[in-house]
Amino acid sequence: MKTRVCAIMSAYNEADVIHESIQKLIQQEVDVYLLDNGSTDETVEIANQFLNKGLIKVERCVFTENGKEVYDWTALLKRKEELSRQLDYDWFMHVDADEIRYSPWAHRNLREGIELVDQMGFNLINFRLFNFRLTHEKSADQSIEEAFTHYSAVEQFNRMQVKVWKKSSDIDLVSHAGHLALLPQ
C-alpha cells in the first residue's frame, strides 16, 4: 500500500503563489490541507479549485485577542499539530504557501521519496533551506521558480529545517517555531 502524505499548508494573502504551490504538491502525490489565516485576497477562491482533487479542506484559521483578529504563529503551529493527530495519513509536512518541496531523488516524486525514507526506518526528514527573493512583480504567466531568481544566504543556524514527520501523537512544532519538528526519543 502507498504511503499517504499530507502537507498542512498555511497561507495569508498568497493569491500570487497558492495555485502553483498546491498544484506542485498534488502532482507529487501529496495531499494538502490548507489553513487560511484570514486572507483578504483571492487565496481561498483559487485554492478551492483543488477541493476533492488533492486538496482535502480549506479551513479558516484566525485567532482573536480582546475581540480583534491577531496573527498567532504559535496557535497556528498547535493547530497543525492537532491536525496531524486527527487526519488519517502516514506522514505530514509543515509547509507555507511560498515554499516548494521536491524529493532529492530525481527519479522519485516527493511522496515516493518520503516512502523510501519510511522504508529505511526514519521518522523525520530534514530539508536544506534556500531563500529566493522576489525582486520584481511576478507576472501571471511566470512560475514561482521563474519569478524568484535572486538567492540570499540563509543564517547558519537556519539552513536545515525538519518539517516532515511520521504520524505521531507527540509531535512538537512549537518549541522551535516550526523550523524543527520534534518527536520524543
Residue ranges: model-predicted function:
Residues D72-K78, S103-Q185:
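Catalytic-site signature of metal-activated, phosphate-bearing donor transferases
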Residues D41-E42:
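Acidic/polar residues in short coil/turn loops that connect beta-strands
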